[in-house]
Amino acid sequence: MGVAPVSNQPLVAQQPKGIIDPSTGKPIGSNDAFFGEINNELADKGFLVTSTDELINWARTGSLMWMTFGLACCAVEMMQLSMPRYDVERFGFAPRASPRQSDVMIVAGTLTNKMAPALRKVYDQMPEPRYVISMGSCANGGGYYHYSYSVVRGCDRIVPIDIYVPGCPPTAEALLYGVLLLQKKIRRTGTIER
């Protein structure tokens, strides 16, 4: 026994609910002539019309506060990144000592089983949205000490990792490239879902 349609009219998709049209990915009304005219008038006067998500992501990439979780020799390269030769603060990437004030945690070095709960505790103290950069072979997968009984084989078993920086130890340029990749990733992602 089937259910017969009530009328022979074609089904019409409902109007999208929200700001973004799911079929195009653009704001609702962006192809409207009225809004296009306003956008063109404001562009001539030096204004920029954008979505709030893009504005928040742009601001977030220019003000990333990082804290160190230096566990071994990779931390020396991480310190070198803050020195005048590379001056990572010009990219809006400034160090902070407290996890409650930082957005990014750089895990650099060998993570042991005894240190893993402390890493998770510090990660949980960071405000959302929070990002983690895993720096060096030891943090990425255990490195040279991979088969030791006391080493965690990658800090991604304890906290979610956003950027992996390979090397033993990775150079400051490699970490700087990882920071730039993180900023690019933040620009791509939405503000609510991560």
Curated annotation (Swiss-Prot):
GO cellular component terms, semicolon-separated: plasma membrane; respiratory chain complex I
Residues involved in [4Fe-4S] cluster binding: 73-74, 138, 168
Cofactor note: Binds 1 [4Fe-4S] cluster.
Keyword check for Membrane: yes
UniProt GO molecular function: 4 iron, 4 sulfur cluster binding; iron ion binding; NADH dehydrogenase (ubiquinone) activity; NADH:ubiquinone reductase (non-electrogenic) activity; quinone binding
Record field: catalytic activity: a quinone + NADH + 5 H(+)(in) = a quinol + NAD(+) + 4 H(+)(out)
Keywords associated with the record: 4Fe-4S, Cell inner membrane, Cell membrane, Iron, Iron-sulfur, Membrane, Metal-binding, NAD, Quinone, Translocase, Transport, Ubiquinone
KW Ribonucleoprotein (keyword) present: no
Membrane disposition: Peripheral membrane protein
Single GO biological process annotation from the record: aerobic respiration
Primary localization class, coarse: membrane
Top-level taxonomic group: Bacteria
Subcellular location(s) per record: Cell inner membrane
Assembly description: NDH-1 is composed of 14 different subunits. Subunits NuoB, C, D, E, F, and G constitute the peripheral sector of the complex.
Family: Belongs to the complex I 20 kDa subunit family.
Protein name as it appears in the record: NADH-quinone oxidoreductase subunit B
Lineage summary: Bacteria, Pseudomonadati, Pseudomonadota, Alphaproteobacteria, Hyphomicrobiales
Gene from which the chain derives: nuoB
